[in-house]
């Protein structure tokens, strides 16, 4: 009698359980594979870590059997675990191996070799990825080293239809990349965003398959769809809001290659999509697939084992000059900056914005470093990016900078702002969520960082917006409050995770004037 069915695919495997004992054993095995979040506990009056989202999928099939979809890296550990605890053998397992089954249709996607030439390290990485027998890889290059270019070349070599799965804020960027790298794809790609567009794609799959070779999907659109199918029980599922189950969706379009950019940003969503979509080849891109949280590192290794990550073996050469500017605020600890879950930059900025006298001094400080590190060194076309945590602070700084530099183009890039704001402005005020990851700003020479944060990923990504410009010292000026304990702690964390990035690492103290050493509250 069969106790389970095991279906092995390129990126994942699917287990259907016919034995009740194996259901409990499987749940025990998967108990560590969750993401966590912090919630405030009223009883103990502090934030505690609680389970958030699983890095696996579980539902009931039509015969009420438990089905689990797990990442490929867990195959051997899982079989070993249930073998030791569930007394299974080859006679009790129904095995289906899909890793040799070809899902993708041919597509003549041509890379523009006349316009783009791969560097030596890009050629080496491309060769390693294309020769990887597991057909599942991550390009883990530092920012500015051409992940998108390398990925576009690799995908063109596969000669199959492509799914590009990205956050909605990167849709425009990847449209540009497709047109730039694939000159023969001008009328052969489509962007799918929103439930109506996705349903139409499912209903008219054959028509779309004939017309397009590259499908660019919004992650949020796909997750709204997949979440419906996570609940395969009762009347809710029978309504079938989407006519095709996610495990059958990609094959209907003849897609053979899967690409995801900035994979570190929503690993839970990327994980779930990988557990459903069946392709012949998978490629993930990120510069910072690391964390200062050990549990997150463990989940990353489960999602993409280190042997499948391809990057440089030599140092990339540091080129960023970092200025660490310590300033002081009168009675700084009295400013609101703490929540139940710890430090909040949002509250800190709101505290400054609510005090006009303090805000004017803060503005003066920001203007000093924009003037020194950008204006005085500026050449035509060079750009400056100012980071703040809140939209309100970004808009305020935009007004201040426009008044100070009326001849320059100064804008925000937040929320609904057009992508061209970021590309064409001389000075842009933006948030980490809008301009911290996944955007390449031509001739960005200076960043003024007003945010204090300890995240390894966020700090490296924001600093990495600065690309190397021959003959120019790119400058990253980071401000932090020297008499606010949390700011000092976060500075030390930033130093730990970014000092290796810097060509120079300098320290200085800001003084409002010759006779004062701190910003006054009033």
Q: Which residues does each PLM region occupy?
A:
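N-terminal pre-P-loop "Q-motif" helix
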Residues: 114-135
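Conserved Walker A/P-loop ATP-binding site and its immediately adjacent core
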Residues: 143, 148-153, 157-183, 389-394
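Conserved helix-turn-beta segment of the N-terminal RecA-like "Helicase ATP-binding" lobe
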Residues: 170-198, 404-408
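Conserved two-lobed SF2 helicase motor
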Residues: 209-231, 238, 423-437
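Post-DEXD/H (motif II) to motif III coupling segment of the RecA-like Helicase ATP-binding lobe
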Residues: 253-257, 262-324
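Conserved interdomain linker/interface between the two RecA-like ATPase lobes of SF2 helicase motors
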Residues: 309-384
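Conserved helicase motor "Helicase C" RecA-like lobe of SF1/SF2 P-loop NTPases
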Residues: 387-414
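Conserved RecA-like P-loop NTPase helicase motor core
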Residues: 411-500
């Amino acid at each position: 009698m069969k106790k389970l069915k095991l279906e092995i695919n390129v990126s994942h495997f699917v287990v259907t359980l016919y034995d009740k004992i194996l259901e409990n054993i499987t749940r025990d095995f998967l108990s560590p594979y969750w993401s966590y979040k912090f919630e405030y506990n009223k009883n103990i009056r502090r934030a505690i870590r609680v389970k958030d989202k699983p890095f696996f999928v579980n539902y009931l099939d039509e015969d009420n059997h438990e089905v689990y979809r797990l990442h490929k890296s867990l195959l051997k550990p899982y079989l070993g675990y249930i073998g030791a605890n569930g007394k299974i053998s080859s006679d009790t397992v129904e095995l289906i191996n899909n890793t040799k089954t070809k899902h993708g249709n041919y597509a003549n996607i041509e890379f523009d070799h006349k316009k783009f030439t791969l560097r030596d390290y890009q050629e080496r990485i491309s060769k390693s990825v294309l020769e990887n027998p597991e057909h599942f890889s991550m390009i883990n290059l530092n920012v500015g080293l051409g992940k998108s270019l390398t990925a576009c070349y690799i995908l063109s070599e596969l000669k199959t239809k492509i799914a590009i799965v990205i956050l909605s804020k990167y849709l425009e960027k990847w449209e540009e990349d497709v047109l730039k790298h694939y000159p023969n794809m001008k009328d052969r790609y489509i962007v799918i965003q929103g439930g109506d567009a996705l349903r139409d794609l499912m209903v008219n799959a054959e028509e779309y398959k004939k017309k397009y070779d590259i499908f660019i999907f919004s992650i949020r659109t796909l997750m709204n769809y997949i979440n419906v199918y996570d609940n395969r029980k009762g009347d809710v599922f029978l309504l079938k809001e989407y006519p095709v189950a996610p495990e059958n969706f990609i094959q209907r379009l003849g897609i053979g290659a899967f690409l995801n950019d900035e994979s570190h940003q929503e690993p839970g969503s990327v994980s779930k999509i990988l557990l459903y979509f069946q392709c012949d080849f998978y490629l993930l891109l990120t510069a910072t697939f690391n964390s200062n949280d050990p549990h997150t590192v463990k989940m990353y290794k489960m999602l993409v084992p280190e042997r499948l990550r391809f990057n440089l073996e030599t140092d990339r050469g540091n080129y960023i000059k970092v200025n660490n500017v310590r300033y002081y605020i009168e009675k700084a600890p009295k400013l609101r900056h703490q929540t139940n879950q710890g430090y909040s930059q949002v509250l800190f900025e709101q505290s400054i914005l609510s005090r006009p006298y303090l805000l004017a001094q803060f503005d003066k400080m920001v203007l000093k470093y924009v003037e020194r590190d950008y204006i005085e060194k500026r050449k035509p076309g060079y750009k400056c990016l100012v980071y703040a945590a809140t939209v309100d602070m970004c808009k305020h700084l935009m007004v201040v900078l426009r008044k100070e530099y009326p001849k320059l183009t100064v804008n925000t890039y937040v929320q609904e702002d057009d992508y061209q704001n970021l590309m064409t402005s001389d000075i842009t005020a933006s948030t980490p969520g809008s301009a911290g990851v996944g955007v390449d700003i031509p001739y960005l020479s200076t960043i003024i960082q007003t945010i204090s944060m300890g995240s390894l990923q966020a700090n490296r990504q924001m600093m990495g917006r600065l690309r190397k410009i021959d003959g120019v010292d790119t400058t990253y000026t980071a401000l932090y409050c020297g008499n606010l304990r949390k700011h000092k702690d976060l500075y030390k964390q930033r130093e730990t995770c970014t000092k290796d990035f810097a060509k120079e690492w300098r320290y200085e103290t800001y003084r409002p004037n010759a006779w004062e050493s701190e910003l006054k509250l009033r």
